[in-house]
């Protein structure tokens, strides 16, 4: 839809003029030109008002009053009235409905020589420093080298600036960064000290660390192998002790203990204790050795292993079987056996002790006595030999008898007095009523 342009209304003294009806091609020419004003005579005083007017067809062509500016040569142009100039308004009517065409510019090209060779660079003088020589990274390397060569890591900044031939502010750039990451500290006004690590150490330290790492790896592998062996042995030992066929063999003999080479010419005491028994050995004195055993699970049994070579003429040697053994240990005993200064402690059904050399076969035992009629038992108390078989531990060697704290009976008891008995109403103290112990208690 085409709208008529707004016109300027003249004063009342002048006649009103309007634009003729024009087609769009006459109103909007394609050419661009500066507007031309038609000479006209108007009144000196007038006022303007903007309003929309109809365009009658009676106006003749070529009238330039109140017309929109167009090109020359028969085209309608806007004529300004004489006197006061109209207000300037910028109307961009040419760009309405038309695509914007960018302004054409000449492309810029690179200057290429005809021969295709680059222009030669101006050579620098021999004394001129390159950019790399004056870089802060290279200056830092030189500064750290001076710091490593200084005594105790203390460096004078004035001397460093003279040696490096740089301004002191560049040295401060380096020291500020190193101080910020806590590698140096300010010792005085112009002295700094290195507080980092691995600057003044042996240069062979990395190779030493690598060697130690390899040794540590080998030790870890060896430890892992030992753990596997211990686990395998523990499992095998558990199966061995839980087997019912092996429980009857859960004992150790005196000969087995005496056959150990480390126990020769030493006093050996075998200890049979329940699980979780606590053994304490205080600091050993010059000649004495003290051992403390404590158990909350049951009684502790202690056995003194005899030395067979000290008593060759013992009367009980023939009657003592060669396989005299300790009492079997309960099934709940846990594995463990410790020896300390001639002390053998047996806590386990099967003790890991080397097998001894079998002793020579003992002499044959005397034949069992034949059955005796009941009437012949009346004179049994008159026999010269003892009724009960005596064992080796009932005889004291001369060496032990001299230092023994036990008091022997004087005169010795007869055979009749060994046959004691108690009634249902008697206690253990009644056994000693038949013998006068007054003299022994006084002494």
Curated annotation (Swiss-Prot):
SUPFAM superfamilies: E2F-DP heterodimerization region, Winged helix' DNA-binding domain. Residues 109-198 bind DNA. Residues 157-178 are annotated as: Leucine-zipper. GO terms for biological process: intrinsic apoptotic signaling pathway by p53 class mediator; lens fiber cell apoptotic process; negative regulation of sprouting angiogenesis; regulation of cell cycle; regulation of DNA-templated transcription. Pfam families: E2F_CC-MB (PF16421), E2F_TDP (PF02319). Residues 361-443 are annotated as: Transactivation. Residues 416-433 are annotated as: Retinoblastoma protein binding. Belongs to the E2F/DP family. Transcription activator that binds DNA cooperatively with DP proteins through the E2 recognition site, 5'-TTTC[CG]CGC-3' found in the promoter region of a number of genes whose products are involved in cell cycle regulation or in DNA replication. The DRTF1/E2F complex functions in the control of cell-cycle progression from g1 to s phase. E2F2 binds specifically to RB1 in a cell-cycle dependent manner. This is Transcription factor E2F2. It comes from Mus musculus (Mouse).
């Amino acid at each position: 839809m085409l709208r008529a342009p707004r016109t300027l209304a003249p004063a009342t003294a002048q006649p009103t003029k309007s634009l003729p009806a024009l087609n769009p091609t006459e109103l909007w020419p394609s050419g661009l030109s500066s507007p031309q004003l038609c000479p006209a005579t108007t009144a000196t005083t007038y006022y303007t008002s903007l309003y929309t007017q109809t365009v009658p067809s009676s106006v003749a062509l070529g009238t330039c009053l109140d017309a929109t500016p167009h090109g020359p040569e028969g085209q309608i142009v806007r004529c300004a009235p004489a006197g006061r100039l109209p207000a300037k308004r910028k109307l961009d009517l040419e760009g309405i409905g038309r695509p914007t065409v960018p302004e054409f510019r000449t492309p810029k090209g690179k200057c290429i020589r005809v021969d295709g060779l680059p222009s030669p660079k101006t050579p620098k003088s021999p004394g001129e420093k390159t950019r790399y020589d004056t870089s802060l990274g290279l200056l830092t390397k030189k500064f750290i080298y001076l710091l490593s060569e200084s005594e105790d890591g203390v460096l004078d900044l004035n001397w460093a600036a003279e040696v490096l031939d740089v301004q002191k502010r560049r040295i401060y750039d380096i020291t500020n960064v190193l101080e910020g990451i806590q590698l140096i500290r300010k010792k005085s006004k112009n002295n700094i000290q290195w507080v980092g690590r691995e600057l003044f150490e042996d240069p062979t330290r990395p190779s030493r660390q690598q060697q130690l790492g390899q040794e540590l790896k080998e030790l870890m592998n060896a430890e892992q192998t030992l753990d596997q062996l211990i686990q395998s042995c523990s499992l095998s030992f558990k199966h061995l002790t839980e087997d019912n066929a092996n429980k009857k063999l859960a004992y150790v003999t005196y000969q087995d203990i005496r056959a150990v080479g480390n126990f020769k010419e030493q006093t050996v005491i075998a200890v049979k204790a329940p699980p979780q028994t606590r053994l304490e050995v205080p600091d050993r004195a010059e000649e004495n050795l003290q051992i403390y055993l404590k158990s909350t699970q049951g009684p502790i049994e202690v056995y003194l292993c005899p030395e067979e070579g000290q008593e060759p003429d013992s009367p009980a040697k023939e009657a003592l079987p060669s396989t005299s053994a300790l009492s079997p240990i309960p099934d709940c005993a846990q594995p463990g056996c410790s020896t300390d200064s001639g002390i053998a402690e047996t806590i386990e059904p099967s003790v890991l002790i080397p097998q001894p050399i079998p002793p020579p076969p003992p002499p044959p035992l005397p034949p069992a006595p034949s059955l005796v009629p009941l009437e012949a038992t009346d004179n049994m108390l008159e026999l010269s030999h003892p009724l009960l078989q005596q064992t080796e531990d009932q005889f004291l060697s001369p060496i032990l008898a001299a230092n023994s704290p036990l008091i022997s009976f004087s005169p010795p008891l007869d055979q009749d007095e060994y046959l004691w008995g108690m009634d249902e109403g008697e206690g253990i103290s009644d056994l000693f009523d038949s013998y006068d112990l007054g003299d022994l208690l006084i002494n």
